[in-house]
Amino acid sequence: MHELSLCQSAVEIIQRQAEQHDVKRVTAVWLEIGALSCVEESAVRFSFEIVCHGTVAQGCDLHIVYKPAQAWCWDCSQVVEVHQHDAQCPLCHGERLRVDTGDSLIVKSIEVE
């Protein structure tokens, strides 16, 4: 379950930011998850709650935003959105795609008191 290690990394980032800005409590966190990141939302929510225990983010609201992946289509020379690894180009139905983004988990925003 790699969601646990991803959430641990996210909470470390949140903790560092909280320390740098003298924040006592984080009330909400927005995570951006790439469409090709292979993470389960329920596992992220479960893991996030566990790793937040005893931190400034304990009990905060978790908001998850999915970001479509972008790929370059070698057949029609266009940047397109894809939602799975073995996708076809939605414009020309070509299969020669170079996926450039979409496999990350990013702390997008933090709301504090």
UniProtKB/Swiss-Prot annotation:
Binding residues for Zn(2+): 73, 76, 89, 92
Biological process terms in GO annotation: protein maturation; protein modification process
The keyword Metal-binding appears for this protein: yes
Keywords assigned by UniProt, alphabetized: Metal-binding, Nickel, Zinc
GO terms for MF: nickel cation binding; zinc ion binding
Residues reported to bind Ni(2+): 2-3
HAMAP family the record matches: HybF_subfam, HypA_HybF
Record family assignment: Belongs to the HypA/HybF family. HybF subfamily.
Function as written in the Swiss-Prot or TrEMBL entry: Involved in the maturation of [NiFe] hydrogenases. Required for nickel insertion into the metal center of the hydrogenase.
Protein name: Hydrogenase maturation factor HybF
Upper lineage: Bacteria, Pseudomonadati, Pseudomonadota, Gammaproteobacteria, Enterobacterales
